[in-house]
């Protein structure tokens, strides 16, 4: 895979055209600091895009026994991939403990979109679905790897072995162990500083 640039110069544009294996979406640019803009990517509700990405990612997960994702943006993607692969179940890691959970397994982490540490949790009843299985981790965007690493820790704590990690997009840096379909660049403007 050719390595696309992770950082582009901000040129005043309001939108960025994302192309994922020939499928295009126009994303608004959002300013997140004085010199930085990000392309806002929200796949929730975009059935056509999710189906396209699932078809592209599914072949990389065919040797996995169980798929795992975190709520909420990964759910439609993993659901579609599970259907393609004929999996009747998949694991969703929740971002908080739920009263119905029995003996939950939890990992603390700080995603890029949060201001404080949160927990990623799976119900203890999922352990038999994970134990001694080959796990494929599915995410929409991988930036800092915090969420993906938390999912991997949950899978291994439950006795599974993570054999594949896939994402629609990466942002911020290339990750050798993650199969991805495209790059979501960060846009930077050079700030002139007065002496």
Model-inferred region functions:
Residues 76-85, 152:
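Short Gly/Thr/Asp-enriched flexible loops that form oxyanion-binding sites at enzyme active sites
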Residues 64-71:
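Short glycine-rich phosphate-binding loop at a beta-alpha junction
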Residues 1-64:
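Active-site-facing substrate-recognition patch
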Residues 65, 133, 163:
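Conserved acidic residues
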Residues 88-135:
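Short, glycine/charge-rich flexible loops or terminal/linker lids adjacent to PRPP-binding catalytic cores
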Residues 71-77, 143-144:
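Gly/Ser/Thr-rich loops at beta-strand to alpha-helix junctions
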Residues 139-152:
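Acidic, divalent-metal-coordinating active-site segment for phosphoryl/phosphodiester hydrolysis
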């Amino acid at each position: 895979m050719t390595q696309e640039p992770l950082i582009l110069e901000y040129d005043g544009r309001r939108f960025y055209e994302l192309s994922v294996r020939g499928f295009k979406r126009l994303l608004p640019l959002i300013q997140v600091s004085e010199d930085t803009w990000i392309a806002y990517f929200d796949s929730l509700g975009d059935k056509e895009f999710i189906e396209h990405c699932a078809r592209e990612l599914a072949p990389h997960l065919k040797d996995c026994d169980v798929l795992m994702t975190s709520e909420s943006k990964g759910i439609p993607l993993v659901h579609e991939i599970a259907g393609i692969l004929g999996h009747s179940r998949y694991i969703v890691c929740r971002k908080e403990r739920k009263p119905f959970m029995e003996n939950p397994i939890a990992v603390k982490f700080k995603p890029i979109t949060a201001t404080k540490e949160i927990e990623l949790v799976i119900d203890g009843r999922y352990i038999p679905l994970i134990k001694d299985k080959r796990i494929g981790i599915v995410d929409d965007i991988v930036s800092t790897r915090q969420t993906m690493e938390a999912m991997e820790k949950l899978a291994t704590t439950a006795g599974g072995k993570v054999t594949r990690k896939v994402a629609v997009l990466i942002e911020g840096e290339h990750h050798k162990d993650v199969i991805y379909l495209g790059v979501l660049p960060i846009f930077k403007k050079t700030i002139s500083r007065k002496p």
